[in-house]
A protein has these predicted regions:
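C-terminal accessory module of base-excision DNA glycosylases/AP lyases that mediates lesion recognition
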Residues: 1-54, 118-195
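Helix-hairpin-helix/helix-loop-helix acidic hairpins
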Residues: 56-103
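Alpha-helix boundary/capping residues
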Residues: 58, 82-85, 115, 143, ...
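Broad structural signal for hydrophobic residues in well-ordered alpha-helices, predominantly aliphatic
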Residues: 96-97, 112, 163
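Short hydrophobic alpha-helical segments that form membrane-spanning helices or hydrophobic packing faces
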Residues: 107-114
Length: 195
């Protein structure tokens, strides 16, 4: 079954929620990882240090020891294969473990988000990749499946691309809006449902 996503908030509010976004780590919301993405996009791969920094940003260090098992050679080789593939299925699954130790679909989606077209450019939204995250999924009224599948991933990508185009925002701004809406509302909604 292909999932159907629908936003929990009006599409007209996407820019407003994007502007409220705050995921500060060390004083920088996402500027550093966007710089890494630009460099990786030009080079066609991530270096190990860049990979580790992006993984740290996404996961706040939870599976750090797994990420650190990846060698410089492995990170460059695997990310180059993923970023150069024309096959969408291979593009995402090449990055997921055992491709890169510790990497699951959410982290793989960040690597694609940052290095496949400029995620800050609204004109690139039809080719850009969203970040798959429980917060963004909640904002789109969908739960993360028990098992990651390409069907789920691709439906999410297509939904986010269409939503970004419809709202005239970049994929980065759409991601920020979905994340921030959940950040400010998900726990409140769950608390009122349990009363």
């Amino acid at each position: 079954m292909t999932p159907v996503f629908s936003s929990r908030f009006p599409k007209s509010e996407v820019p407003e929620w994007a502007n409220r976004y705050s995921y500060t780590q060390g004083g920088d919301d996402d500027g550093r990882v966007l710089e890494i993405g630009e460099r990786s996009r030009r080079a066609g791969y991530f270096t190990r240090d860049e990979f580790l920094e992006v993984c740290e940003w996404k996961t706040r260090g939870r599976p750090r020891r797994h990420y650190q098992r990846n060698s410089e050679e492995d990170v460059r080789r695997v990310t180059a294969m993923a970023l150069s593939s024309a096959d969408e299925d291979k593009r995402i699954w090449t990055l997921v473990a055992p491709g890169l130790a510790g990497v699951q679909m959410p982290t793989a989606s960040v690597l694609l988000h940052l290095a496949s077209g400029d995620p800050r450019n609204p004109l690139m939204a039809p080719q850009a990749y969203p970040i798959i995250d429980f917060r963004a999924l909640w904002s789109l009224n969908w739960e993360k499946p028990r098992r990651d599948t390409f069907t789920f991933w691709w439906a999410y990508v297509q939904t986010c691309r269409a939503l970004a185009v419809e709202c005239c925002v970049s994929m980065r701004d759409l991601d920020r809006a979905l994340w921030e809406y959940s950040n400010q509302n998900q726990n409140k909604a769950q608390n009122t449902c349990s009363d």
